[in-house]
Structure formats: structure tokens, C-alpha cells
A protein has these predicted regions:
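Short beta-strand-loop/turn "lid" adjacent to the catalytic site in phosphate-handling enzymes
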Residues: 51-98
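Short, low-complexity, polar/charged sequence segments that are solvent-exposed and flexible
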Residues: 22-24, 45-49, 81-83
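A short, N-terminal amphipathic alpha-helix
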Residues: 40-55
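Short hydrophobic/aromatic-rich motifs at helix boundaries and adjacent loops
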Residues: 16-18, 45-48, 87-91
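Short glycine-rich, Thr/Ser-proximal phosphate-binding strand/loop in the N-terminal lobe
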Residues: 2-44
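Residue-level preference for the first positions of well-ordered beta-strands
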Residues: 1-2, 60
């Protein structure tokens, strides 16, 4: 499963996709800038469980953020959650898309 997340000013939206691009689930969390990486991890893992998904099923993660205060905390939470490839959308990302 590929996990895609977007940190916006109000919400963190995310979804799980099969490797052929089919949406498995989508959800959102309030984007609270006071959350620690562990609190973000807890919330994400519990949302995955709500939809019957487990961190071990995640093979890759891609995320974007417009909230600099949350970006490093989310990155750390994702690294704790899975040992998969984590891509951050931003300048210099080599995505293969032109």
C-alpha cells in the first residue's frame, strides 16, 4: 500500500492506495501545530486501524506540506512507522513525472 499525505493549514488529509492506484481509504486529521511526532504517529496508526490497514502493509509514503512547523514532525513519525521509502513533495524531488 502507498500512503499519501498532505499537510494543509487546517487538515492533514491522507489516503492509502494499492500499487496500481486504487484508493483503499481516505481520511483527515486536524492539523494541530502543537502535536509531537509521537502524537502524529499515534493518530495516523489509529486511523489506519480504523480502515483495517496496518503500518506493515505500507510499502511507500509520499507527503506534501504547507505547514513548516509540522513537516519535520510528520517526517519523523513516518520514519518510526515504517521502514519504507518516504518521499517529500518539494523542490528537487525526483518523482519521474515531468
Amino acid at each position: 500500500m502507498i500512503l499519501a499525505l498532505n499537510i494543509g493549514n487546517s487538515n492533514i488529509t491522507f489516503g492509502g492506495y494499492t500499487t496500481d492506484g486504487k484508493l483503499v481509504f481516505s481520511s483527515r486529521l486536524f492539523a494541530d501545530t502543537a502535536l509531537s511526532s509521537d502524537e502524529l504517529l499515534y493518530k495516523i496508526v489509529n486511523m489506519l486501524a480504523l480502515y483495517g490497514a496496518e503500518p506493515q502493509q505500507i510499502t511507500a509514503v509520499i507527503f506534501s506540506s504547507v505547514v513548516p512547523a509540522l513537516t519535520p514532525r510528520l517526517r519523523e513519525a513516518l520514519r518510526k512507522m515504517c521502514e519504507c521509502q518516504i518521499m517529500e513533495v518539494g523542490p528537487g524531488l525526483k518523482s519521474g513525472v515531468r
